[in-house]
Curated annotation (Swiss-Prot):
Keyword ATP-binding: yes
Organism: Corynebacterium diphtheriae (strain ATCC 700971 / NCTC 13129 / Biotype gravis)
InterPro entries for this protein: SAICAR_synt/ADE2_N, SAICAR_synth, SAICAR_synthetase_CS
Organism classification: Bacteria, Bacillati, Actinomycetota, Actinomycetes, Mycobacteriales
Name of the protein: Phosphoribosylaminoimidazole-succinocarboxamide synthase
Gene of this entry: purC
GO MF term (any one): ATP binding
Length: 297
């Protein structure tokens, strides 16, 4: 349910986030507990998910050396009490029309494309790679941003160049791969593999590239436990892949080819998903989730 924040104008809604205007220069981004998969918003919500995503984004915004969209602390006076801990005050930006994906391992849509063409978004890869193969080096695989309910479409780097120009496209690619590599090294120290992730960038009033939206959360990333890694198999994960696997497994009775919406998630899947999200936060940050602002109110 969308929070009714009467002091602000509601600007837009996504699958997970609600955006409100604070003033001429700032927005309030509120992260819900909604979870989406295969372009559907699922029922029921995952308890505490919005706070986990906000906590992880804040952690990485403060620990990754790159300009970001934050315009205030997590307890900024502009944040209403009812959304404290799952909202952040952000700068208004001109958002760029691409999801900037970095892949260090082959899985998901990247694996499917590789099996069909030997490439991912136009990047040629060696023969013989399988599920969860580590790539020789991380690759940049952009996608267009789809409207709510539509599919993001993987595109080649050339498409980014055509849309944004060579200099800006190179800047996007370099930033994406640098941030991914920095975060992957941090995760590795904590016994976790960052298989892939996606970023969104915008431009500030000076035309400077700024990291925005969410960053390195279990919604936007695939996190695998390093001690269970085995090439050629679907990996256990600390992200919403667990939900995707249940939806496409025999117990759900649903298929991605169905025209009907997915079924409601059973309580066991909801709780297991919450546990995975919380564990991802605690293992990567070294912090206790119960100490995050708003968790014990």
């Amino acid at each position: 349910m969308r929070p009714e924040l009467s002091q602000y104008t509601h600007v837009s809604a996504g699958k997970v986030r609600e955006i409100y205007e604070v003033d001429d220069e700032r927005l309030l981004m509120v992260v819900s507990d909604r979870i989406s998969a295969y372009d559907h918003i699922l029922e029921p919500e995952i308890p505490d998910k919005g706070r986990v995503l906000t906590a992880m984004s804040m952690y990485f915004f403060h620990n990754i050396d790159f300009p970001n969209h934050l315009a205030g602390p997590i307890d900024d006076p502009a944040i209403p009490e009812e959304v404290l801990g799952r909202a952040m005050v952000c700068k208004k930006l001109k958002m760029l029309p691409f999801e900037c994906v970095a892949r260090g391992y082959l899985t998901g849509s990247g694996l499917k494309e590789y099996q069909e063409t030997g490439t991912v978004c136009g990047v040629e890869l060696p023969e013989g790679l399988v599920e969860a193969s580590k790539l020789p080096e991380p690759i940049f695989t952009p996608a267009t941003k789809a409207e709510l309910g539509d599919h993001d479409e993987n595109v080649s780097f050339d498409v980014v160049v055509e849309k944004l120009g060579e200099a800006r496209a190179n800047e996007l690619r370099d930033a994406t791969l640098r941030i991914y590599s920095e975060a992957a090294a941090l995760a590795e120290e904590r016994g976790i593999i960052l298989a892939d992730t996606k970023f969104e960038f915008g431009l500030d009033e000076d035309g400077r590239l700024v990291l925005a939206d969410e960053v390195l959360t279990p919604d936007s990333s695939r996190y695998w436990p390093a001690d269970g890694y085995e090439e050629g198999k679907v990996q256990p994960s600390f992200d919403k892949q667990y939900v995707r696997n249940w939806l496409t497994g025999p117990k759900s009775g649903w298929s991605t080819d169905d025209v009907t919406p997915p079924p409601s998630l059973p309580g066991s899947v909801v709780e297991a998903t919450r546990e995975r999200y919380v564990e991802a936060f605690e293992r990567i940050t070294g912090k206790k989730f119960c100490e995050w602002i708003g968790c014990c109110v």
